[in-house]
Amino acid sequence: MAIRLNKVTKLLNVGLSTIVKFLQSRGYLREENPNTKISPEEYEILNQEFHKDKHVKLDSEKLSKERFQKENYDKDKLKQIEEIKMGIPRSNEFQLLLTSKLDLDTLPQDKSQTTIEIKKTIKTSEIKEIKRENKTDILKERKQIEEIKNSYLNKQQKKSNLLSSTDSTINFTITGKIDLTTINNATRPKRKTKEEKQKEREERNKKIVNIKTEKTTQVNAGKKSIASTQTNIEILKRKKRNRIKHEKVNIEQQNISTIPNPKNKHFKFHKPTYKNEVSEEDVQKQIKETLAKLTNSSLKKGTKYRKEKRDTLLQLKNEQYKIKTQENKTIKITEFVTANDLSKMMNVPVVQVISTCMSIGIMVSINQRLDSETIDIVADEFGYKTEYVSAEAIETIIDDENENQEKELVLRPPIVTIMGHVDHGKTSLLDNIRNTNVIAGEAGGITQHIGAYNVKLDDGRKITFLDTPGHEAFTAMRARGAKITDIAIIIIASDDNIMPQTIEAINHAVAAGVPIIFAINKIDKHGANPEKIKETLASMNYLVEDWGGKYQSQDISAKKGIGIQELLEKVLLEAELLDLKANPKRYAIGSIIESSLDKGRGYIATMLIQNGTLKLGDIVLAGIYFGRVKAMFNERNLKIKEAGPSQAVLVLGLNGAPQAGDTIRVVKTEQEAREIAAKREQLQREQSLRTQKLLTLDDISRRIAVKNFHKLNIIVKGDVDGSVEALSDSLIRLSTEQIQINVIHKGVGQISESDVILATASNAFIIGFQVRPSLLTRKLAEKEGVEIRLYSIIYNAIEEVKSAMEGMLIPKTKEEITSNVEIREVYKITKVGSVAGCIVKEGKIKQGDKIRLIRNGVVIYTGELGSLKRYKDYAKEVTQGCECGLNIHNFNDIKVGDIIETFENIETKQKL
């Protein structure tokens, strides 16, 4: 179960920033927000790291608890001692009972001999053994003596009242006489002398000793009946006892609860109980014992059956919950899904998906399709499981592996991809090899498509070259080129450094497991330094053969043809080591390089045959499209009837433009191709529905928080699929927090009327890359007010969209102080108000400027300048060092010494 960071900080006794930094170092990207929730796995990692701080907190709490208990115990102890000193009465009761009855008829006539025997009896159950082990027992004994005296006096008084109410025939013995003449002679009794007080004190002490001696004798005799004694005790007072000193007891060490003595009923207070800290093992042991007691084996059959039924239902519910949770974490996808679609299905930012791919050595873009292996790795990183719904459609294609028999395999030409940075000489190298001028046909002299060419050398051997764009927008193209190639030539200009696109191309080749040959170009140019390039490669862990490494390299000049033959020899040598073979007699399998829509010929696709032979009339299946091969052309636009392994051809006859990177296969019948294509199209529609993300409350809140939020809708049309994908990818990456770019539609071919209607409905504009609208489309766009922008170089398209985004941003307002004026004199003029005579200290004051009145460093008023005069004439401006007169619009509270500051608000254009 997820737990918030603020709770984790309290549990682990660690600061929030420390926890966030630790999680970020472990790869968990977290914002420093106390309300952010973390998973149980992350909490377990934090617990392992900061368990020491947690124990420190627990120990501190334990010490404070013990200190608090000790203080409370000391307070209770002092309170009890005070109560004892105050003489709180105990529950002991002493009763005076008549031991016999007097027969009044048989009494002698002599009343003087009538006596009364007062017997005192004490309940035997009240006499307990007195132990003087500590101070508490001593205090108890004192209290008992005091109670004996008090209860005796009370009973004596009751007895006297009882006797006074008896029959008058009872005779009493006269023991003494009172002189009534001495009573009430004075209002106050006479003071006793010291000798009399001392005598009375000694008598009282003797009687107390007699009582104690009698009580001690009775206790030592055991639990026998105590004989009543005939006493005539006067009012007693207690003498202060000698204190018996005992050793001090350490309360902290005495961690055992005090158990009261059952024999002593006067036990009134208890020492505080100190319990030991309960360990986790004791708790678990106690739980097991309790469960064992509750689980009675001798239950009735009905009770046992109901219990088993409840357990079964609970287990079934838990299993259903687990299955439901697992289904929520399972995403159903097709095999070649784009990184953007995958991020939407997992509900994570696309940036995290791309960074995850880069961490495993795979360079991807937003709209680049991922293979099943990469999808599995990325989904597992975010805790999702994948289920490929297109497996059924793929399995319907029977790939007869038996056709790949050893005797039918023949050597095939190597497929070589030329990769590198912009303007490092990739196309120039290919021109020199083919003896043509490809660059002349490219806009801006920059390659913007994957070019596939077959080259036949002088000795009859063939090589298929793929020329990839070097611009950063064509990352997906380079990745596709690396996947379908056998050997990669990385071309580097010797007068330049190793650029980011060069490193990216090397990473693509290494990720695809393709052998690399480095071609260091422009060695004929002034300032060329091939050794510096080799040194840089060595620092990147790519050691060339000249430096004792395993990577081949060749210094060349693409313009002058220096080192070209040596480079081709190394390519063929590498191909021989790879032992590239294919079976030309089986059904063709290949990859789509580019696809486009030609007005006269329909949908055309450039494909590279990897195995088998493609013939005219074959039924091909590529992605969700299918068709019969109507015509095939080579790279020189010449018709051919068949294409063997490692050959690039242009195919006509498909019913749509398949995506670059799709696999093309030959199937037996058109019916089979139609069924598979329909099934794939259905799966693709389901996929698009899953990736549609509706506007949520969080999105609305975010847009409200980011003020002036804008959306820019774009429709992209291009000549080939690869260029459209690259341009769309680059435009989506321009999105910011304030402006979101949505490519609502992209496709190949001419800009049509349906594109204009879609742009009208969605308030979008159209970007055409090397395509033109028809005449009717242009008129409809003018009528509907839809803007169509046409480009032939990808740089220009990206820069203009960026400028349009900057124009949508609200300009920043910057305040600039233009002058500083000091008031020297103030004049009061009727119907005008206060006029200030000033001198311009700094800058230039102008008519109509906004002003700020400052007095003693505090802004008093902000407003506008009313009028400005130089001598007697109105002035448009007054420069530094000159005197002037002015007044402030609707404000007259000005004083000598005030400072007037003029300023302007300048708006500056925001940049992305």
Swiss-Prot record:
InterPro entries: EF-G-like_DII (IPR053905), EFTu-like_2 (IPR004161), IF2_II (IPR044145), IF2_N (IPR006847), P-loop_NTPase (IPR027417), Small_GTP-bd (IPR005225), T_Tr_GTP-bd_dom (IPR000795), TF_IF2_bacterial-like (IPR000178). Signal peptide: none annotated. Residues 420-427 are annotated as: G1. GTP binds at residues 420-427, 467-471, 521-524. GO terms for cellular component: cytoplasm. Residues 557-559 are annotated as: G5. Pfam families: EF-G_D2, GTP_EFTU, GTP_EFTU_D2, IF-2, IF2_N. Its main location: cytoplasm. Keywords: Cytoplasm, GTP-binding, Initiation factor, Nucleotide-binding, Protein biosynthesis. Gene3D superfamilies: P-loop containing nucleotide triphosphate hydrolases, Translation factors, Translation initiation factor IF- 2, domain 3. This is Translation initiation factor IF-2. It comes from Azobacteroides pseudotrichonymphae genomovar. CFP2.
